[in-house]
């Protein structure tokens, strides 16, 4: 979207706070239903980030695939579980929880250091295609394929990795209960 600077900044802050609050809700809420709805909030905020960066197709794919399919699948899996086991139980951390927390924290800090050490000055941020494409010779499907393999390659791959992780998490939750 081509918005004026202050409005764009306000929307970025609003969506960023929605992402942070939704992510904290996914991790900290003890009721799995509330965690699943917080995950839905996170996925919708990510889709709105794509809309702000003029990636309308990726935003639509994000909404259809993740919010419409994966999040609904997770909510159904959680609803089929026995919800009374999770409402007020307090449990102590096990060794596996500590190891998982340590691994996730180390990955987070390595990502933060990588992002901070990267020289972002040489990267050209453009929304135009890297190839010259004749409008008359290509169909809409071919244009989508060209854009997915050039301009939106990295977001498309990240979306596929997130989808894989979400499916593995849903399968793991369903097997445990």
Curated annotation (Swiss-Prot):
The gene is ndhG. The chain crosses the membrane at residues 10-30, 32-52, 61-81, 90-112, 152-172. NDH shuttles electrons from NAD(P)H:plastoquinone, via FMN and iron-sulfur (Fe-S) centers, to quinones in the photosynthetic chain and possibly in a chloroplast respiratory chain. The immediate electron acceptor for the enzyme in this species is believed to be plastoquinone. Couples the redox reaction to proton translocation, and thus conserves the redox energy in a proton gradient. This is NAD(P)H-quinone oxidoreductase subunit 6, chloroplastic. It comes from the Eukaryota. The lineage of its organism: Eukaryota, Viridiplantae, Streptophyta, Embryophyta, Tracheophyta. The keyword Lipid biosynthesis does not apply. NDH is composed of at least 16 different subunits, 5 of which are encoded in the nucleus. Keywords: Chloroplast, Membrane, NAD, NADP, Plastid, Plastoquinone, Quinone, Thylakoid, Translocase, Transmembrane, Transmembrane helix, Transport. Pfam families: Oxidored_q3. It comes from Acorus calamus var. americanus (American sweet flag).
């Amino acid at each position: 979207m081509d918005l004026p600077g202050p409005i764009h900044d306000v929307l970025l802050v609003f969506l960023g706070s929605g992402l942070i609050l939704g992510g904290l809700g996914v991790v900290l809420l003890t009721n799995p239903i509330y965690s699943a709805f917080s995950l839905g909030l996170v996925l919708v905020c990510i889709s709105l980030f794509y809309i702000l960066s003029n990636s309308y197709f990726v935003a639509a794919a994000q909404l259809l695939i993740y919010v419409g399919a994966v999040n609904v699948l997770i909510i159904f899996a959680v609803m089929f579980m026995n919800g009374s086991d999770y409402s007020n139980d307090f449990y102590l951390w096990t060794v596996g929880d500590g190891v998982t927390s340590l691994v996730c924290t180390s990955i987070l800090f390595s990502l933060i250091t990588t992002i901070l050490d990267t020289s972002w000055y040489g990267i050209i941020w453009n929304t135009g295609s890297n190839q010259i494409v004749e409008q008359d010779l290509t169909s809409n499907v071919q244009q989508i394929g060209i854009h997915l393999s050039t301009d939106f390659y990295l977001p498309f791959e990240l979306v596929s990795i997130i989808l894989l992780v979400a499916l593995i998490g849903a399968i793991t939750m369903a097997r445990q209960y």
